[in-house]
Design a protein with these regions (language model features):
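A conserved acidic beta->alpha catalytic loop
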Residues: 45-53, 99
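Short beta-strand/loop segment that forms part of the nucleotide-sugar
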Residues: 26, 35-48, 68-70
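Acceptor/aglycone-binding surface of glycosyltransferases and processive sugar-polymer synthases
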Residues: 72, 78-86, 103-182, 209-219, ...
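Hydrophobic helical membrane-anchoring modules
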Residues: 1-6, 17-18, 177-238
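Short, well-formed alpha-helical segments that are part of the catalytic scaffolds
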Residues: 15-32
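Conserved donor nucleotide-binding strand/loop of the catalytic core
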Residues: 54-86
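Catalytic metal- and UDP-sugar-binding loop of GT-A-like glycosyltransferases, i.e.
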Residues: 70, 95-97
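Short aromatic/hydrophobic "clamp" motif used to bind/position activated sugar donors
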Residues: 92
């Protein structure tokens, strides 16, 4: 694997039924769009304990999908670091297993990495995103983005969009993250923005119309407040 290879990293934890079929279908679409490129698909099982995972797992065994597993559950950040560390592609993209963003959006990330030679491409949600989002999630997202915009000097306040890509320079930065759960995205953008030599692009992307949102865990949100504070402290004391 090398210059023409993209590693697609997909973390999974207690997925809904049909998750494996979605991965196979969407990865097939990407391969059709870029027939001259090799795609390394890596699924990282973050300690799933559901039968849905086991049922889908068997469907991946006969396909060109690499599966990494561990227990117990450690968080999305740790799952992605595990997958990124194991990846062998020159470029890396990560998203969620339900592929919540359009294939065209993923293609924009790929083109920015391949054609524009960007080190890191950060997907940000287009304005119509909030038309699809449940009220509680919408409110929490807007409050979070307000604090990011007001308190941190980084290139975007939409750090939690679940579609990002990077080359080997960006990979090295990503592997420096330490947050195990959701604010690893913010930490990644924060670390990248501190190095002015890194070529970062902010790319607007679109949500698929039929995306189903999971219920938000308020306990995790409380815990992530501490991680936000740690990043904020680092931004001021170095």
């Amino acid at each position: 694997m090398g210059n023409n290879t993209i590693s697609l990293i997909l973390p999974v934890y207690n997925p809904a039924s049909g998750w494996a079929e979605i991965i196979l279908a969407k990865s097939k679409e990407l391969r059709a769009l870029y027939p001259d490129m090799d795609f390394e698909v890596i699924v990282v099982n973050d300690g799933s304990v559901s039968s849905n995972f086991d049922n889908g797992k068997s469907k991946l065994k006969s396909e060109s999908v690499r599966l990494i597993e561990y227990t117990p559950n450690k968080g999305k950040g740790e799952a992605l670091r595990t997958g990124v560390l194991a990846s062998s592609g020159e470029m890396v993209i990560y998203t969620d297993i339900d592929f919540p963003y359009t294939i065209d959006s993923m293609s924009r990330i790929i083109r920015s990495l391949c054609d524009e030679k960007r080190n890191i491409v950060i997907g940000i949600k287009d304005p119509s995103y909030y038309d699809h989002v449940p009220p509680l999630r919408r409110s929490i997202s807007r409050v979070f983005r307000f604090f990011v915009r007001s308190l941190l000097r980084i290139p975007t306040d939409d750090t939690q969009c679940g579609l990002k890509g990077f080359d080997q320079v960006g990979k090295a930065v990503f592997l420096k993250t330490t947050i195990d759960r959701y604010l690893f995205d913010l930490e990644f953008v924060f670390l990248a923005s501190r190095d002015r030599s890194i070529n970062i692009k902010i790319q607007e992307i679109e949500l698929r119309d039929d995306v189903q949102f999971r219920k938000m865990n308020l306990g995790i949100i409380r815990n992530e407040a501490w991680n936000f504070l740690k990043i904020l402290i680092r931004s001021y004391v170095g």
